């Protein structure tokens, strides 16, 4: 039975509101007469804008306060960018839908110069350590500048901070209609995307069957299998969204191919591997690929990045 009213928790950034409004619109189309309310919530990641996310530390910088509101019963569902969602949830909450993925690639924005034609020592603005590591691996001469802020702010920094280029997720630019500023889209073999990049996740209270049934139509099976594989890899590597780990899954028929990457922040040491198997084994494939990456040098790289040991073995939760 469809609900009469649904409250959506969301961050207040332009992109987060676009995403939440898209979910609202789809709900209203499917359930005419349903009252859908957006509840804006400020997260710690929104409040701390002058420090790189990797230095803020911790997991769930963009979801914790939203989850707390859900546990208090103030909202019914939350809409997240999947790349911001930690691999573990507070008791009673969970990810119940993963939407069809928008373009998962990274977008390169410059004054018309492609990545291949960047001058020596060019300054590149990015918010992600995984982008930094991958691009320094092929161009160690580049100077990486960590930038924060919403999509428009980051685009402006190209001019304001006299940068040669900035790199953002293509999905956000496409959703907000900023594709005209993109110089090129970086191929995934150059810049492997963040875990879950381009997909949205819908979280709710696991015991709220009415809500679960109401939002179930958002789930896109191929995207869900790919993203679950990526997240299983991240979980096994004990990574948050601010470590130099990347993974991208692609589904073809009943088969899933997953590529994973672990690197030191400066890109001097890295390991990259792929694995294929049935989509029904998506999480097992993610964990198997993580084990392979860790065994081939990823363990030592991450121990240095985290400045602590990474588990040699990790119990899979039931």
Curated annotation (Swiss-Prot):
The keyword Transferase applies. Disulfide bonds: none annotated. It holds the Pfam family Porphobil_deamC. Pathway: Porphyrin-containing compound metabolism; protoporphyrin-IX biosynthesis; coproporphyrinogen-III from 5-aminolevulinate: step 2/4. The keyword Transferase applies. GO terms for biological process: heme biosynthetic process; protoporphyrinogen IX biosynthetic process. One of its GO terms (molecular function) is hydroxymethylbilane synthase activity. Its cofactor is dipyrromethane. GO terms for cellular component: cytoplasm. The porphobilinogen subunits are added to the dipyrromethane group. Monomer. HAMAP family: Porphobil_deam. Belongs to the HMBS family. Tetrapolymerization of the monopyrrole PBG into the hydroxymethylbilane pre-uroporphyrinogen in several discrete steps. This is Porphobilinogen deaminase. It comes from Geobacter sulfurreducens (strain ATCC 51573 / DSM 12127 / PCA).
């Amino acid at each position: 039975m469809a609900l009469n009213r649904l409250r959506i928790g969301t961050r207040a950034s332009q992109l987060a509101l676009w995403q939440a409004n898209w979910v609202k619109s789809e709900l209203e189309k499917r359930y005419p007469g349903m009252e859908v309310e957006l509840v804006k919530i400020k997260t710690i990641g929104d409040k701390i804008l002058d420090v790189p996310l990797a230095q803020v530390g911790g997991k769930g910088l963009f979801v914790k306060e939203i989850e707390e509101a859900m546990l208090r019963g103030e909202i019914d569902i939350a809409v997240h960018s999947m790349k911001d969602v930690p691999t573990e949830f507070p008791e009673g909450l969970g990810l119940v839908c993963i939407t069809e993925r928008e373009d998962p690639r990274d977008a390169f924005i410059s004054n018309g110069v492609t990545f291949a034609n960047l001058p020596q020592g060019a300054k590149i603005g990015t918010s992600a350590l995984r982008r930094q590591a991958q691009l320094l691996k092929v161009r160690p001469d580049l100077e990486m500048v960590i930038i924060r802020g919403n999509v428009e702010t980051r685009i402006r920094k190209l001019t304001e901070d006299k940068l040669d280029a900035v790199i953002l997720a293509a999905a956000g630019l496409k959703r907000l209609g900023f594709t005209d500023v993109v110089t090129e889209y970086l191929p995934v073999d150059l810049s492997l995307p963040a875990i879950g990049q381009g997909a949205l996740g819908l979280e709710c209270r696991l015991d709220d069957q009415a809500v679960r049934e109401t939002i179930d139509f958002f789930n896109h099976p191929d995207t869900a299998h790919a993203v679950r594989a990526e997240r299983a890899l991240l979980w096994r590597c004990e990574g948050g969204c601010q470590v130099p780990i990347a993974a991208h899954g692609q589904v073809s028929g009943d088969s899933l191919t997953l590529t994973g990457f672990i690197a030191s922040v400066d890109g001097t040491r890295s390991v990259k591997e792929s694995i294929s198997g049935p989509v029904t084994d998506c999480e097992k494939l993610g964990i198997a690929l993580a084990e392979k990456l860790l065994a081939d040098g990823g363990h030592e790289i991450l121990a240095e990045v985290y400045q602590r040991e990474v588990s040699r073995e990790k119990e899979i939760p039931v």
